[in-house]
């Protein structure tokens, strides 16, 4: 098989949550444990940090990976979803797993795993852990796919667990209250493994504290003693932070929501500092300043061009848009133009209520079966006095926005990681 044929096989022969939604979700770790045993428990050959949460997992995971790389470690990074290439999910020191390794994994192992009927994520997790062990990474940042307690990454025993925040998402699997969702996320809290909680409310704090007490695990709430004292936009891009323990740091990632992520990361760094894993403050500054270069991160308030300024961002739910909407509203420009689409398991009405009413909209739909039809998005937008035209693809919507824009305008592309993925994929092909 070619690489493209291999990726198509993975997507078409295993249930993929990003494509089909609920039918791809599997409760339980039975298949994961069978795969893990077959590959001789690869996750036991490297240290790990486990990252769960509704929003901010990707930014926190990539920033931690960058800091650890700057410290001199060989670092594995497992995240989802990908934007352009499947291999983005599995990286070592910012380098994606090779196409040949993906091909070999499927060709050599399919006779074993096909009778198990694994989900896409179960198979991808097995590939990631196997790759990290073979590459002899020192430490891996492992991002939870969905939930925590029953997520197939939850076979690891990390040196640190992180839960970024909790909001109402994937309620059909995780529960329809913050407390119920927190209980699922708290499933990654392990016996005597410290856990950092990025953001919380009383309803979730109770759950996290109870689980940590049961596991005799140190629990640290990042908001109790904030590691970030203040922040402001850096003139050369990104955000400048004044920190409690590490002086002034410039973070490469833009977007007002990154202050919360930075606070979570720095609180986690303090735990790693106490363990002797991180020893140099210079590594922290270097990691923050070079996240994209060191890890290949895309889609976080990512600048695609200037004049007109074009920004894309993968924020896709109420929690993410709480910050994104304010950032967009504050953006100085002649006219805001927003290319927007969403998928059908998100609260379209809640996000619509946050969108700026002074923008011109280009309603579209990403190329996933889970997408809200662009016509449905436009129809819902009418209820909020938001107006624009409908486009059948993200690229068509983006090209229309570019054609309409003056140099002083601001174009934002987002609403879903799949919208951003479609755009970046199309731009790469041009």
In which residue ranges do the predicted regions lie?
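Short functional linear segments
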Residues: 1-53, 60-62, 66-71
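ATP-dependent carboxylate-amine ligase catalytic core
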Residues: 22-29, 34-37, 41-44, 70-156, ...
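Short Gly/Thr/Asp-enriched flexible loops that form oxyanion-binding sites at enzyme active sites
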Residues: 64, 149-159, 424-428
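Short internal beta-strands
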Residues: 78, 194-199, 338-340, 359-367
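Nucleotide phosphate-binding/pyrophosphate-handling subdomain across enzymes
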Residues: 134, 139-144, 152-162, 166-170, ...
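Acidic, Mg2+-coordinating active-site environments of NTP-dependent enzymes
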Residues: 143, 160-245, 262, 266-282
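C-terminal helical cap/extension that packs against the catalytic core
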Residues: 201-220, 309-312, 318, 351-410
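Active-site-proximal loop/hinge segments that shape catalytic or ion-binding/gating pockets
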Residues: 416
């Amino acid at each position: 098989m070619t690489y493209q044929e291999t990726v198509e096989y993975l997507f078409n022969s295993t249930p993929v949550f990003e494509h089909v939604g609920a039918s791809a979700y599997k409760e339980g770790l039975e298949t994961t444990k069978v795969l893990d045993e077959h590959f001789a428990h690869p996750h036991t050959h490297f240290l790990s940090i486990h990252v769960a949460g509704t929003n901010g997992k990707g930014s926190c995971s990539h920033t931690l990976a960058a800091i650890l790389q700057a410290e001199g470690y060989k670092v594995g990074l497992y995240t989802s979803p990908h934007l352009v290439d499947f291999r983005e999910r599995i990286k070592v020191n910012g380098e994606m797993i090779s196409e040949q390794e993906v091909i070999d994994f499927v060709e050599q192992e399919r006779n074993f795993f096909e009778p198990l009927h694994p989900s896409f994520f179960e198979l991808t997790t097995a590939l990631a852990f196997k790759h990290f062990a073979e590459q002899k990474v020192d430490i891996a940042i492992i991002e939870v796919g969905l939930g925590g307690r029953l997520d197939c990454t939850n076979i690891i025993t990390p040196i640190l667990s992180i839960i970024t925040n909790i909001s109402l998402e994937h309620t059909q699997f995780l529960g329809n209250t913050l407390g119920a969702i927190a209980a699922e996320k708290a499933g990654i809290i392990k016996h005597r493994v410290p856990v950092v909680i990025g953001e919380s409310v009383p309803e979730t704090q109770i759950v996290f504290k109870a689980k940590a007490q049961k596991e005799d695990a140190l629990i640290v709430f990042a908001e109790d003693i904030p590691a970030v004292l203040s922040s402001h936009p850096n003139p050369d891009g990104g955000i400048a932070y004044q920190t409690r323990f590490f002086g002034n740091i410039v973070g490469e990632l833009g977007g007002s929501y990154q202050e919360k992520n930075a606070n979570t990361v720095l609180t986690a760094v303090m735990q790693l500092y106490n363990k002797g894993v991180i020893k140099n403050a210079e590594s922290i500054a270097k990691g923050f300043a070079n996240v994209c270069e060191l890890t290949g991160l895309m889609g976080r308030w990512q600048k695609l061009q200037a004049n007109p300024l074009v920004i894309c961002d993968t924020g896709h739910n109420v929690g993410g848009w709480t910050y994104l909407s304010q950032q967009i509203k504050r953006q100085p420009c002649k006219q805001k133009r927003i290319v927007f689409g969403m998928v059908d398991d998100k609260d379209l009405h809640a996000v619509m209520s946050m969108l700026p009413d002074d923008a011109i909209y280009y309603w579209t739909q990403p190329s996933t079966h889970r997408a809200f039809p662009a016509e449905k998005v436009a129809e819902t937008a009418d209820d909020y006095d938001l107006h624009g035209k409908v486009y059948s693809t993200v690229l068509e919507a983006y090209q229309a926005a570019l054609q309409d824009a003056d140099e002083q305008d601001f174009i934002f592309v987002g609403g879903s990681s799949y919208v951003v993925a479609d755009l970046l994929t199309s731009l790469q092909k041009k």
